[in-house]
Amino acid sequence: SQGSSNLWPSEVIGESSGGFTFSVRVLGNANVTFRDLGTIESSLDSGERFGEATRTYHDGVVQLDQRTTADGVDLPDDGYTSYWSMLNDSQVLPDQSGIAFHNYSTISDGATVDAESGSKPGFDLELSRRFGGFGKRMSDNRRPGSWGGFLGLGLTDINAKTTGTINATLRSITDVYSLDGATPPTAPYTAPSTETVTVIGPDGTETSVVINNSILLANQPISRTVTDEAGAAAIDGFWQVKGTYVSARTGVWSRFHISRQLSIRASAGVSFHLLGVDMRYDERLEDETLAVPIRAQEQGETTSYEAVGLFGSLDVELWLTRRTGLFASFTYEGLSDDLALTLGGRTADVELSSGAGFRFGLTTLF
């Protein structure tokens, strides 16, 4: 009809000089194995065993003594301090002769966890140029087939993450301080401590008086032991590899019109990939008996990688006008690469592959 000839003139779609597509693509995945997990160094300073110093622990602190005379003059060192604190009653030795303080850290037992980043949507642009046509001309003087070259650019995100609990060796540094015969306090306890008492004078007058009832503790350990218990630390963790890869491609294409409104387009070429990824982790050992959680967390800087692969696609195109249409495409990018990221003594083995994917979007000819 006349309306049909206006919509689909004899200058057929396939004889346009070039084209442009904008689409959403779903492509690629990454499998990640995180290795050597679970080493957490203590953030507390327990110092050396000998000598007067402030020593901090996961269940208390022993500070330098700050006792003074009534005139504010420091008392001579008598080997004790009234500035210390404890968190748990279990720190009192069975014979009640002293208090045990602990500084914990963990050592990796080689724990591993796996994470996967499945196919995620990204954006894709392609610019094409027609080089020629093929096939016997039809009654309207058009050729059913055409071919040319293309340049394409795609963007895809990677986000492989997981949470879980791993086991590691628990290292305990135990320092024992003498009470020198004093009665152990009830935990939690902080010295110096005071007590308010009522004093009755000779005339029967009651007066409230604040007295120092601090319990003195030795100002340095009488013993120190270090023990390692394999698998005793249950560590909760979060591990992630995150990034983006940009793929550029070039090659040749061929289009064949089944009808005025329906065509099939195939393309093949090479693809170039630039990948930027970073690794992060957060591992922690928490317990109600610890004043400070044992924790290690870090995020690494973005690391760049380059790779080359193959590209192929098969498109089904539905033309809405002589120059504009919709398309759906099955794609393949033959990219396969193994990467290794290291951070804080931990390693992430990344197996990156593109494989089969899908695109859909808008195409226009000019």
Residue ranges and their predicted role:
Residues 1-39, 95-166, 230-263, 267-269, ...:
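Outer-membrane beta-barrel transmembrane strands
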Residues 1-83:
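N-terminal, post-signal peptide beta-strand-biased segments of exported outer-membrane/organellar beta-barrel
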Residues 35-40, 85-118, 158-245, 274-307, ...:
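Extracellular/periplasm-exposed beta-strand and loop segments of Gram-negative cell-envelope proteins
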Residues 44-51, 56-60, 122, 179-181, ...:
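Glycine-centered flexibility motif
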Residues 55, 78-82, 102, 187, ...:
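Intrinsically disordered, low-complexity segments enriched in small/polar residues
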Residues 67, 224, 363-365:
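Surface-exposed charge patches in extracellular/virion surface proteins
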Residues 69, 201, 321:
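Acidic surface patches and DE-rich sequence motifs
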Residues 318-327, 337-340:
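Substrate-binding/catalytic groove segments of enzymes
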